[in-house]
C-alpha cells in the first residue's frame, strides 16, 4: 500500500474489511515496505509514490513503516507479518530509484554500513536494548523553515533541544516509542538538535545537525543515478 498501489493508510481499511468479511480466519502478511535511496531526501511527502520513477526518498520509506507497522501491531487478526527487507539487495534487470540493479527496500544499505531510519523504528519498537534516535539525519539540507522533529525512544519521553533551547509540545505518534515535535522553526544556517533521556541514573543522548538556507522543494531534479556494484 502506497508503493505499488493505493495509499499508505489504505492498509487499515483493508485489514478491517478482511476482519469483517472473514472473522473466523487469520491473516499472515507476506511482505510490506517501500524502497529508500539514502541519497534521496525530502520533507515533501504524499501518501503514495510512483515506484516507476527514479526518486526513492528515504523519508517515504520511514513514513510507510511507521504507519503500517502501527496498523499491524494493533490488529491481532494479523498473526504474522514480514517486512521487506532487512538489507538492500541486487536485482540485475532493474533500473530505478537512482541505483541500477538494486532493490532498496532494506532497512540497511547493500554494503551493511548504513542503518536507515526504518531500522531504528523497528529496533525501538521490538528490542529491549535502549534506543534513542532522531530521524532524518541524512536530510540535512532542509526545505522548510517550519518543520517537525521525530524521535524514537523506548526508554521514555525525550527532551529535545534546538540550538540549546528546549522544544515544547511533544506528542505521541503511532506507537509508544514514537515522539513528534510539530511546528519547529529553524534558524538560518546550522541547526543542532539534541535528544536526551535520563533513565536509571544514566543519560542517553542523540545529536544531529540540519542546515536551513531558504524555502525550497528539491524534487527529483536534484539527484543523479549512481553506478554501484550489483553484488553478483
Regions found by a protein language model. Give the residues of each.
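Surface-exposed, short loops/turns at beta-strand junctions within beta-sandwich domains
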Residues: 183-190
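Beta-strand signatures of extracellular beta-sandwich domains
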Residues: 157-161
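Substrate-binding/catalytic cleft of secreted carbohydrate-active enzymes
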Residues: 1-125, 129-143, 164, 174, ...
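Surface beta-strand/loop "capping" patches
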Residues: 123-155, 221-232
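Short hydrophobic alpha-helix segments
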Residues: 170-171, 207
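Edge beta-strands of extracellular beta-sandwich domains
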Residues: 201-214
Amino acid at each position: 500500500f502506497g508503493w505499488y498501489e493505493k495509499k499508505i493508510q489504505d492498509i487499515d481499511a483493508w485489514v478491517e474489511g478482511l476482519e469483517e468479511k472473514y472473522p473466523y480466519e487469520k491473516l499472515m502478511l507476506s511482505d510490506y515496505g517501500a524502497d529508500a535511496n539514502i541519497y534521496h531526501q525530502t520533507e515533501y511527502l504524499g501518501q503514495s509514490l510512483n515506484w516507476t520513477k527514479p526518486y526513492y526518498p528515504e523519508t517515504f520509506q520511514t513514513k510507510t513503516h511507521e504507519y503500517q507497522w502501527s496498523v499491524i501491531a494493533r490488529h491481532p487478526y494479523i498473526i504474522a507479518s514480514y517486512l521487506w527487507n532487512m538489507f538492500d539487495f541486487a536485482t540485475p534487470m532493474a533500473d530505478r530509484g537512482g541505483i541500477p540493479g538494486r532493490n532498496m527496500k532494506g532497512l540497511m544499505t547493500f554494503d551493511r554500513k548504513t542503518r536507515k531510519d526504518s531500522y531504528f523504528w523497528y529496533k525501538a519498537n521490538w528490542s529491549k536494548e535502549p534506543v534513542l534516535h532522531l530521524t532524518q539525519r541524512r536530510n540535512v539540507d532542509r526545505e522548510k523553515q517550519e518543520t517537525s522533529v521525530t524521535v524514537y525512544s523506548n526508554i521514555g519521553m525525550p527532551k529535545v533541544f534546538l540550538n540549546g533551547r528546549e522544544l515544547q509540545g511533544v506528542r505521541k505518534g503511532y506507537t509508544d516509542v514514537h515522539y513528534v515535535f510539530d511546528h519547529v522553526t529553524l534558524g538560518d544556517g546550522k541547526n543542532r538538535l539534541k535528544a536526551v533521556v535520563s533513565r536509571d541514573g544514566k543519560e542517553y543522548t542523540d545529536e544531529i545537525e540540519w542546515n536551513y538556507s531558504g524555502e525550497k522543494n528539491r524534487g527529483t531534479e536534484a539527484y543523479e543515478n549512481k553506478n554501484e556494484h550489483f553484488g553478483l
